C-alpha cells in the first residue's frame, strides 16, 4: 500500500476515535474510542518505520510496547468501570460524580 493511503486510514481512525471520545456519554464506549486512537497511532508507527527504514523494526517494536500499555490501560479502565457500575448502577460519564464529595 502507498504511504498516503495508510496515513489517510490512520487519520480517519484517529478522527473517529477522537469524535467518539469527545461525544461519548458511556465509559465503556469512551475506552473503546481511546483504544481506537491508540491503534491509529500504532499504524503510524509501523508505517513510518517501514517507509523510512524497513530493515530496522523500531516502529514495530514501539507499537508492541504501546499495545501492551493499552492492554493494561483497558484492564484497569474496565475494572474501574465495573466498580463504578456496582456502586452507582450506571456507566454514564455525566452521572459519575465521585470527586464531588
From Swiss-Prot:
Name of the gene this protein is made from: ndhE
Similarity remark: Belongs to the complex I subunit 4L family.
Question: What InterPro entries would the database entry show?
Answer: NADH_UbQ_OxRdtase_chain4L/K, NUOK/Mnh_C1-like
Write the protein's name.
NAD(P)H-quinone oxidoreductase subunit 4L, chloroplastic
Q: How does it sit in the membrane?
A: Multi-pass membrane protein
Q: Subcellular localization, per the record?
A: Plastid, Chloroplast thylakoid membrane
Q: Which UniProt keywords apply?
A: Chloroplast, Membrane, NAD, NADP, Plastid, Plastoquinone, Quinone, Thylakoid, Translocase, Transmembrane, Transmembrane helix, Transport
Output the Gene Ontology terms for molecular function. oxidoreductase activity, acting on NAD(P)H, quinone or similar compound as acceptor; quinone binding
Please provide the Gene Ontology terms (biological process) for this protein.
ATP synthesis coupled electron transport; photosynthesis, light reaction
What does it catalyze? a plastoquinone + NADH + (n+1) H(+)(in) = a plastoquinol + NAD(+) + n H(+)(out); a plastoquinone + NADPH + (n+1) H(+)(in) = a plastoquinol + NADP(+) + n H(+)(out)
Q: What Pfam families does the entry give?
A: Oxidored_q2
GO CC list: chloroplast thylakoid membrane
- Keyword Membrane set for record: yes
Q: Which organism is it from?
A: Helianthus annuus (Common sunflower)
* Superkingdom in the source lineage: Eukaryota
UniProt keyword Transport present: yes
Description of how the protein assembles with itself and partners: NDH is composed of at least 16 different subunits, 5 of which are encoded in the nucleus.
Role according to the record: NDH shuttles electrons from NAD(P)H:plastoquinone, via FMN and iron-sulfur (Fe-S) centers, to quinones in the photosynthetic chain and possibly in a chloroplast respiratory chain. The immediate electron acceptor for the enzyme in this species is believed to be plastoquinone. Couples the redox reaction to proton translocation, and thus conserves the redox energy in a proton gradient.
Amino acid at each position: 500500500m502507498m504511504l498516503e493511503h495508510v496515513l489517510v486510514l490512520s487519520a480517519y481512525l484517529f478522527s473517529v476515535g477522537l469524535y467518539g471520545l469527545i461525544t461519548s456519554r458511556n465509559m465503556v464506549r469512551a475506552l473503546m474510542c481511546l483504544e481506537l486512537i491508540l491503534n491509529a497511532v500504532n499504524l503510524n508507527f509501523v508505517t513510518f518505520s517501514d517507509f523510512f527504514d524497513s530493515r530496522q523494526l523500531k516502529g514495530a517494536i514501539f507499537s508492541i510496547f504501546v499495545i501492551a500499555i493499552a492492554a493494561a490501560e483497558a484492564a484497569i479502565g474496565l475494572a474501574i468501570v465495573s466498580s463504578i457500575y456496582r456502586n452507582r448502577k450506571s456507566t454514564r460519564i455525566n452521572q459519575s460524580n465521585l470527586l464531588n464529595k
